[in-house]
Each structure stands twice: as C-alpha cells, then as structure tokens.
C-alpha cells in the first residue's frame, strides 16, 4: 500500500505543477493585458473632431430650409450622413479609452477648426448658398488640418484610418463646394 500511495503521489505531483503553471500563466497574461493601441494624440483628435463634426451637422441642418438648390441640399445631406456615424465611433473610442467625451461645443469658436456662423441662419437663397459654402469650405479645411496633424502623431489604427478618410473625403467635398460657389 505504501508503494501504491507513493506511486499515486508521484503521478499527481506533475499534474499539480502543470495546473499551477497554467493558472500562473493565465494570471500573468491577464496582468499584462494587450498593449494600448492609442496615445494622447488619438484622444485629442477624437475630442476635437466630435464638436467639429457636430458643428457641420448644425450647418447642414440649416440647408433644406434656406435654399432650393438641389445640389447643395444633396451635399449637406451627404455630409450629415457621413459625419453622424463618425461622431458615434469617436465617442465610443473615448468611452473605451476612459477619456472624457467633450461636451457639445455650440459656441462657434475658431478652436478645433470651427467657424463663426454669424448670421448664417438669417440668410436664404443665393446669399445663404454663398455664405454656407464659404463657411463649410473653411470648416472642412480645418478638419483636414486636424486630421493631417493627427496622422503625424496618432498611433491607433482605427483613429488613423478615420483621419485618412477625413482628408480624402473632405478634400473632394472642398473641390465640389468650390465648384458650387456662386460667382460674384
């Protein structure tokens, strides 16, 4: 019997060590976690671009009631349709990163590439079209500048992809808006 007990202890000892090593490995991996893919530039980009996009939504919301230009109405709708989900994505990243989600900035300041809307809501027709296009061109240029700055410093792949998309899409929209800008 004594030999049988020793034999059983010899067999359980390696199994116990293996179990202990497995538990230690799991704990070690959990403690290490996956490396952060974002940095402060990614957080700053998302925090700045959210209110910037919100201002574009505000501006786009004015278009249907201020102009009858179907091309401008279509452009404003496309801008809003593209930027609404981007706002949601950026706010999601900020929550995931435990970073403050900035309060909506309807102060219309020049910060973060924002533009001064002035009396835009009081205009209509061709006067509105000209002012809206001029402001949205300026607004888009601010977004492109923010995105390019981010590309030089950001590390998160998803955030960098969004910044690249902002540059390519908004540069195309700037060209479109310049072609729509009434002369004179």
Where are these regions (language model features)?
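All-alpha RGS (Regulator of G-protein Signaling) helical domain and cognate RGS-like helical scaffolds
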Residues: 33-184
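C-terminal motif of bacterial Sec signal peptides marking the signal peptidase cleavage site
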Residues: 28-31
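Bacterial N-terminal signal peptides that target proteins for export
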Residues: 4-22
């Amino acid at each position: 019997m004594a030999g049988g007990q020793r034999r059983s202890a010899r067999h359980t000892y390696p199994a116990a060590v293996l179990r202990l090593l497995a538990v230690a490995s799991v704990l070690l991996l959990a403690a290490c976690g996956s490396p952060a893919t974002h940095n402060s530039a990614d957080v700053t980009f998302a925090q700045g671009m959210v209110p910037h996009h919100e201002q574009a939504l505000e501006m786009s919301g004015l278009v249907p009631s201020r102009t009858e230009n179907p091309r401008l109405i279509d452009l404003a709708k496309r801008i809003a349709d593209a930027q609404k989900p981007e706002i949601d994505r950026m706010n999601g990243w900020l929550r995931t990163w435990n970073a403050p989600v900035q309060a909506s900035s309807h102060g219309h300041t020049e910060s973060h590439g924002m533009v001064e809307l002035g009396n835009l809501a009081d205009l209509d027709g061709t006067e509105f079209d000209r002012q809206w296009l001029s402001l949205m061109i300026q607004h888009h240029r601010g977004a492109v500048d923010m995105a390019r700055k981010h590309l030089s410093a950001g590390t998160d792949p998803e955030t960098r992809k969004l910044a690249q998309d902002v540059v390519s899409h908004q540069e195309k929209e700037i060209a479109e808006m310049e072609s729509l800008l009434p002369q004179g």
